[in-house]
Design a protein with these regions (language model features):
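Catalytic NTP-binding/metal-coordinating core of nucleotidyl cyclase/transferase enzymes
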Residues: 1-86, 90, 97
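Intrinsically disordered, glycine/charged-rich C-terminal tails and inter-domain linkers
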Residues: 4, 136-260
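Short catalytic/ligand-binding loop motif for oxyanion handling, primarily in non-cytosolic enzymes
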Residues: 18, 114-115, 147-150
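Short, glycine/charged-enriched secondary-structure capping and boundary segments
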Residues: 23-26, 119-121, 155
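Short, surface-exposed helix-loop/turn micro-motifs enriched in polar/charged residues
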Residues: 61, 80, 102-103, 117-118
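A short glycine-enriched loop-to-beta-strand structural element that forms part of the catalytic core
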Residues: 68, 72, 100-114
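Catalytic-core segments of nucleotide cyclases and related cyclic-nucleotide turnover enzymes
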Residues: 82-85, 114-130
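Catalytic/regulatory signature loops of cyclic-dinucleotide turnover enzymes
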Residues: 96-99, 103-104, 108, 125-145
Length: 260
């Protein structure tokens, strides 16, 4: 058995420990509502990533255990980077809609990832990126992953077009790391981009406002980062919506979002 050259993403759902504790009442009884909520979140993730339909993703392996998700695919897979980043963004969107956030790291290297085994230097690197470098609710990667995606561009794309498509899913942060832009870039991934996006931003705003005042600095700093990514964008889209007629459904939806 030999390692394969693969690109791997390690995702961790933030605050999952507390959500699990909340699924058991003070009297020791199960909270059926909370357990059902957690199960629904994982159900949406499994559906998004085709975890239960491996025939739909022949080059991609996906493993989910507790609050962690690992996705990997051959580094040479045509269009693999773009497809993976799109899938990860959809996972982030579904988590937000359920009231959750995640953090992650994407690395390239030697890996064995089968339905029964998962190990290798690339896995260690992806986990290290998530746990020691991501810091905030973001999924980070460096230029090496972008370059790999361009080199293995989809057959219907020129390399320059593939690069443009990949960069369209990303933002570059102040520390130089690229991250998947699930704040301003999420609209096109929603079922009804025009109508669903105000609700999505409302959910993001609620997540931030409910946790940004945490007494734990390591928690509050995560939501302060997210607030910085959302606050100006929220003002921009709300101002744009005011160009619509009074009583317009979309205008009303944006105006219903409280400021941060």
């Amino acid at each position: 058995m030999n390692y394969k050259d693969r690109i791997v993403c390690f995702l961790d759902i933030l605050g999952f420990r507390e959500h699990v504790f909340d699924s058991v009442g003070a009297d020791g009884s199960d909270s059926v509502t909370k357990i059902s909520e957690l199960a629904a979140v994982f159900g949406r993730i499994r559906e998004t990533l085709d975890i239960d339909c491996p025939e739909n993703r022949p080059d991609t392996e996906v493993t989910q255990f507790s609050d962690s998700i690992v996705i990997s695919f051959p580094a040479y897979a045509e269009g693999g980077v773009f497809d993976a980043l799109s899938g990860i963004m959809r996972v982030q969107i579904n988590l937000v809609l359920g009231g959750y956030l995640c953090r992650g790291g994407i690395a390239r290297g030697r890996l064995i990832h089968t339905p029964t085994m998962l190990f290798g230097p690339a896995m260690v690197e992806a986990y290290t990126l998530e746990s020691q470098a991501a810091h905030y609710p973001r999924v980070i990667l460096d230029a090496e992953i972008i370059n790999a995606g361009v080199a293995a561009h989809a057959s219907h794309h020129l390399p320059s077009s593939e690069q443009q498509s990949i960069l369209g899913l990303l933002k570059r942060d102040l520390d130089g790391m690229y991250y998947i832009d699930y704040v301003t870039g999420a609209q096109s991934e929603l079922d009804d981009p025009e109508l669903d996006y105000p609700n999505y931003l409302f959910k993001l705003r609620d997540i931030i406002s409910s946790r940004i005042l945490s007494n734990n600095p390591s928690v509050s700093i995560k939501y302060k980062w997210l607030r910085e990514k959302l606050v100006d964008h929220l003002q921009t889209v709300k101002q744009s919506a005011r160009n619509r007629p009074q009583g317009d459904e979309i205008r009303d939806a944006y105006e219903s979002i409280p400021d941060l």
